[in-house]
Amino acid sequence: RYFGAAVPAFKLSDSQFTGILDREFNAITPENEMKWDATEPSQNQFRYTSGDQIVSHAQAHGMKVRGHTLLWHAQQPAWVQNLSGSTLRSAMMNHVTQVATHYKGQIYAWDVVNEAFADGGSGARRDSNLQRTGNDWIEAAFRTARAADPAAKLCYNDYNTDGINAKSTGVYNMVRDFKTRGVPIDCVGFQSHLGTTLPNDYQTNLQRFADLGVDVQITELDITQGSNQANMYAAVTKACLAVTRCTGITTWGVRDNDSWRSGDNPLLFDSNGN
């Protein structure tokens, strides 16, 4: 099992940040450096400098890399917004192929698709330009990623799926269908951006996915500061340890001031690195 953190490339020059990272963590998720807008800012013109920097740091310190993320409705480059239908679909699959091929053999697990299910009680797919290319786009992405990098574990990643609810059940049904039909999916990521309470069926939910024959991973953990914060970090860790196929936990940053929700002081280290 691993314990990881999300890392932006520019923080690798911050000695306090890297000191904690290299001492306490053994896996890295690039925060933004492998997203579509970063890696293919213009169509068919790929840019990997920042992502490569993160991979190099990980390799130098014996850390795993979770690739994040090949296809997502957000943080798309402007040119993608002008495409639709089969033109967009082919650009999507070309992007998956090119990026996964560039990092072939260097990525422990890829978030192939991120956040493709709707919030609320429908359990349905989120409407997006990706979804409008046809409901089979997720399957196509996983098959394309497997062809490009057969050794990487291929994950589906989402948020608000931390307990058993309509959204997590929608994801569950997709994963079950994929496993039944032999679509290559190896893991499911649970972002776990949490408030002050943990769903009481958190571990049960992880286990039901594991029972489908996939690994489960906590991928973007952060927890609102308060009297329950330490207890919740412990509870999430214990839940993962109790599920044999829960292969690791990643916190979404290192120090509170690194966090996208820094006002919540949600991470394990404070802004002074303590």
Describe the role of every protein-language-model region.
Residues 23-43, 47-162, 208, 225:
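Substrate-binding cleft and catalytic face of glycoside hydrolase catalytic domains
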Residues 243, 247-273:
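Aromatic/acidic polysaccharide-binding cleft in carbohydrate-active enzymes
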